[in-house]
Regions:
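Primarily recognizes Gram-negative and organellar outer-membrane beta-barrels
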Residues: 1-189
Length: 189
């Protein structure tokens, strides 16, 4: 079994004046990978059929996940103690899950069943792709004894799943698109 993971984050903040105008730019990435191998043997004796079934099965499981995002925000003072903020983020994520099963049923000893290749009926390979856009617009009021904000967020998302190995590899699923939106209100005294 092997597992790897790597993540990173980069941020830049720049004040454009002393009244509250500023800009923020950020980026994130992540990668993880894992692989597991397993081996099993079974022997089944069928008394009524007077036969024996010997199965040796080797399974190689792999998964990996990759993601990255970029974001930017801009804050503008509009009048005393009040600021408008505009923020945008794009995020992409890809996930792979693969399980390749190699079978030796009665006649194929190890390692010959590797040469025959994996069993398509028992194996799978699925890739999922996700894209998310997020746009926020808000106004904030900051006072010595209280803080408040109101805004709205729009989040269009798309997802796609592709199966290239296994019994469902002939099914082509459509891309799914969703638009979420949410108002926000905050008051702190």
């Amino acid at each position: 079994s092997n597992n790897y993971s790597l993540n990173g984050n980069l941020m830049m903040f720049r004040r454009l004046n002393n009244k509250g105008r500023n800009i923020h730019v950020g980026a994130r990435f992540g990668y993880s990978d894992s692989e597991t191998d397993s081996y099993s043997e079974s022997s089944t004796e069928f008394f009524e059929l007077d036969s024996i079934s010997d199965i040796a099965r080797y399974t190689n499981r792999t998964s990996d996940s990759r993601n990255w995002s970029v974001s930017a925000s801009y804050t503008e003072p509009v009048f005393k103690n009040h600021f408008v903020q505009l923020r945008y983020e794009f995020a992409h994520r890809k996930q792979l899950a693969q399980s390749l099963v190699y079978d030796s049923i009665n006649k194929y000893p190890y390692p010959e069943y590797f040469e025959r290749g994996y069993d398509n009926e028992l194996s799978t390979k699925v890739e999922n792709f996700y894209d998310t856009h997020t746009a926020d617009l808000s106004i904030r009021g900051i006072h010595p004894k209280m803080m408040y904000s109101a805004g709205v967020s729009l989040t269009p998302q798309s997802s796609l799943s592709e199966t290239t190995i296994g019994p469902n590899s002939d099914r082509h699923l459509p891309q799914q698109n969703v638009l979420n939106w949410a108002p926000s209100v905050m008051f702190r005294y």
